[in-house]
């Protein structure tokens, strides 16, 4: 496999991923993603210990332990473009050798938990209600830029497009199902 070009993998002189300003050792396998920077400390204050606190631009990272388990909380800022940067850079941290710029043959998977605010269409769901979503819908078309679109719920997406009379001039929406394993972790607190 050929090394990635400098424009494909932007790292600092200190071998940190550029936007997040992080090293591999500074993140956990379980990562809570929040939009707002202030939410990072609101969550990490419940950690038993904090080993790393890093901030670069709107990206704030706290990594520590909670009940003996290593966990990170990272702010992405607002919008799917920022979340895309965060997830791609975290993936690079664990799946690319920064010295050779070659993608590892054995890829590591991280567990992401998105924690944020949402509107509701149901009257019985009040403001500030905690929810765990089984599905998410994207309107910006970002998922279509990635090869692995098997995660898109095609039948549900097509039904939504038809029902909403989605305009063809807009990016095609997509619906994805949350990881059953992740939902179970959150609902039953088996790991946290």
Predicted regions and their residues:
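Metabolite-binding pocket within alpha/beta catalytic cores that recognizes anionic/polar moieties
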Residues: 2-175
């Amino acid at each position: 496999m050929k090394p990635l070009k400098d424009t494909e993998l932007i790292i600092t002189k200190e071998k940190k991923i550029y936007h997040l300003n992080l090293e591999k050792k500074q993140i956990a396998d379980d990562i809570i993603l929040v939009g707002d920077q202030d939410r990072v400390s609101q969550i990490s204050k419940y950690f038993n210990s904090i080993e790393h606190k890093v901030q670069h631009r709107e990206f704030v990272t706290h990594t520590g332990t909670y009940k003996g388990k290593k966990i990170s909380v990272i702010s992405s800022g607002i919008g799917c473009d920022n979340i895309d940067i965060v997830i791609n850079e975290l993936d690079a941290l664990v799946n690319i050798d920064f010295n050779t710029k070659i993608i590892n043959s054995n890829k590591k998977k991280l567990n992401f938990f998105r924690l944020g605010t949402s509107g509701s269409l149901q009257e019985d769901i009040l403001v500030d209600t905690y929810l765990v979503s089984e599905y998410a819908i994207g309107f910006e078309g970002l998922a279509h830029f990635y090869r692995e679109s098997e995660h898109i719920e095609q039948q549900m997406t097509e039904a939504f497009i038809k029902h909403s009379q989605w305009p063809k001039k807009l990016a095609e929406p997509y619906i994805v199902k949350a990881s059953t394993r992740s939902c179970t972790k959150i609902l039953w607190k088996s790991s946290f």
